[in-house]
Amino acid sequence: NMITAEPIAQAEQAAKTAALNGVLPAFDETAAETLTIDEMPITVYTATKGGQLAGYAVESMTKNGFGGAINMMVGFTPDGEVINVNVLKQAETPGLGTKMADADNVLLRSVKGQKLEEKKLVNGKLAVAKDGGDVDALTAATISSRAYVDAINRAWMAYKSVAMGATPTDVSSGATSAAGDSAEEQTSGPEAQEGGQNE
């Protein structure tokens, strides 16, 4: 088993490096910090080049995908603009939710090159148009689209926590209400989308 463990670890490291390269400008070093947000591990990579801050890459996830968990890498400039989003793992419906991994898909176009705080937020978070936000959803894949946005929101919280020292609870509750409210919001999400139709 040791024979296969080494190449698998190398392959995973290579995939991680490729994912970082896909969402960050040129860098020569990264420092990783893992936070727990909504009981999920979210890792923030602070990238530097020649000792200067180059950007942040956040390995984020959601458990609300139509086909289960979705993992992604989200890159931010030092001042919070989304550089790129790289979907690392998803099991969404082929031809519908899987489009979230396509280059230049509508979800990506809704966030790439933008500062998320300047978007139309709902309770301080990104949301798809159907939920009052301004992120365009994938056609016939609203649940997948909501899950994508959920993972981006978590990445944004982690970025703000590391880059600006905001605590994830402050960020998730919009800093005005008690942290209990955000926990309540979380639980109502997945139940509302049961029923088999990714619509």
PLM regions: where:
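Flexible, solvent-exposed loop/hinge segments and secondary-structure transition points
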Residues: 1-199
